[in-house]
C-alpha cells in the first residue's frame, strides 16, 4: 500500500468526486486548518454534535444504544465537551472512496495537544457518505471543539489491487450516512 500525495488526492477529488466539497489548499485564516495537505486531506467537523452525559445513570451499550445517553447540540461556533467526556460529530465533506483505496483518519495536532482525541475507524473501499467523528476529552477540564473548522487528517492508502469484496459489495451498515450516525448492529 502507498499513501496518496496531494496530486493524486486532487485528481481523485476532481475526476471521481472522492471529496465534496473539495478545498484545493490548506485554509487557515485564524481557524484550525482544513483542506488539501501534502499527503492527506484535513476535514472539517459540521455544526451538529451529540454530547454524552450521565444524567440518567444509564449504561452505554452499542447493541442497545439509547438516546438518553447524550444531548444534541447545534452550533455554528463551538461546543464544549465536559471533562473526561465524549462527543460525536460529522464531517462537512462527503467521501466517495474508490474501490482500490482505503482511508485511515488521525486527529490534528492542535486538538491532540489540548487533550482531545479524535477517533475514526478505518474507511473502507467504496464507502460513500459523511464520516462520523468521535471526540474524547481526556482532560479534567471542559474543552472546545470548533464547528466548521479542521479536526482530522484523512490519509488515503492505495492497495496493490482492488479487493475481492468492498464495503459497498457487503452493503455496509453505515453506507450513505449523513449527519451524526449512532451505532448500528
UniProtKB/Swiss-Prot annotation:
Its EC number is 3.5.4.13. Catalyzes the deamination of dCTP to dUTP. InterPro entries: dCTP_deaminase, dUTPase-like_sf, dUTPase_trimeric. GO terms for molecular function: dCTP deaminase activity; nucleotide binding. Belongs to the dCTP deaminase family. This is dCTP deaminase. It catalyses: dCTP + H2O + H(+) = dUTP + NH4(+). CDD domains: trimeric_dUTPase. Pathway: Pyrimidine metabolism; dUMP biosynthesis; dUMP from dCTP (dUTP route): step 1/2. One of its GO terms (biological process) is dUTP biosynthetic process. Keywords: Hydrolase, Nucleotide metabolism, Nucleotide-binding. DCTP binds at residues 108-113, 132-134, 153, 167, 177. The active site is at 134 (proton donor/acceptor). It is an enzyme of class 3 (hydrolase). Homotrimer. It holds the Pfam family DCD.
Amino acid at each position: 500500500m502507498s499513501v496518496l500525495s496531494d496530486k493524486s488526492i486532487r485528481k481523485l477529488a476532481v475526476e471521481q468526486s472522492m471529496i465534496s466539497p473539495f478545498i484545493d489548499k490548506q485554509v487557515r485564516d485564524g481557524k484550525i486548518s482544513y483542506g488539501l495537505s501534502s499527503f492527506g486531506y484535513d476535514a472539517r467537523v459540521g455544526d451538529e454534535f451529540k454530547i454524552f452525559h450521565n444524567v440518567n445513570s444509564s449504561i452505554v451499550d452499542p447493541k442497545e444504544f439509547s438516546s438518553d445517553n447524550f444531548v444534541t447540540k447545534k452550533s455554528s461556533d463551538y461546543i464544549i465537551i465536559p471533562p473526561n467526556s465524549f462527543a460525536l460529530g460529522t464531517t462537512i465533506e462527503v467521501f466517495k472512496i474508490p474501490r482500490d483505496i482505503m482511508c485511515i483518519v488521525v486527529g490534528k495536532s492542535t486538538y491532540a495537544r489540548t487533550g482531545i482525541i479524535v477517533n475514526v475507524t478505518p474507511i473502507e473501499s467504496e464507502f460513500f457518505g459523511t464520516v462520523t467523528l468521535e471526540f474524547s476529552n481526556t482532560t479534567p477540564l471542559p474543552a472546545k471543539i470548533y464547528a466548521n473548522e479542521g479536526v482530522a487528517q484523512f490519509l488515503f492508502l492505495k492497495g496493490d489491487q482492488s479487493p475481492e469484496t468492498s464495503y459497498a459489495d457487503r452493503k455496509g451498515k453505515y453506507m450513505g450516512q449523513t449527519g451524526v450516525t449512532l451505532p448500528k448492529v
